[in-house]
Amino acid sequence: MYAIIKHSGKQYRVSQGDELKLDRFEAEVKSSVEVSEVLAVCDKELKVGAPFVAGAKVVLEVIAHGKDKKVVIYKKRRRKDSKLKRGFRRQFTRVRVVDIKA
């Protein structure tokens, strides 16, 4: 059984027991979060929502919060002695899929 969920404008295919990194959201570590924006559920047959499947929920357990590796953005304009170097670290929340209710 798997489900396709929408979170922070992105779509994820999840199964029970999967771990994934979502964009950071406010939740306590080891707490449960329910996602009701389920686009599709497959349990022997595929149910596709319009836009969401009615009554379907995915229960997530928050494992940890953290930051990704730094991404360096470097811009240089030739012959103008103009350059720009910036860094960015995306914050994420690591979650585990506990249950899929369809």
Swiss-Prot record:
Keywords tagged on the record: Ribonucleoprotein, Ribosomal protein, RNA-binding, rRNA-binding
GO biological process terms, semicolon-separated: translation
InterPro entries to which the protein is assigned, alphabetical: bL21-like, bL21-like_sf, Ribosomal_bL21, Ribosomal_bL21_CS
Molecular function per GO: rRNA binding; structural constituent of ribosome
GO cellular component entries: cytoplasm; ribonucleoprotein complex; ribosome
Database matches in Pfam families: Ribosomal_L21p
Record family assignment: Belongs to the bacterial ribosomal protein bL21 family.
Quaternary structure, from the entry: Part of the 50S ribosomal subunit. Contacts protein L20.
Function: This protein binds to 23S rRNA in the presence of protein L20.
Name of the protein in its database record: Large ribosomal subunit protein bL21
Organism: Campylobacter lari (strain RM2100 / D67 / ATCC BAA-1060)
Lineage: Bacteria, Pseudomonadati, Campylobacterota, Epsilonproteobacteria, Campylobacterales
UniProt gene name: rplU
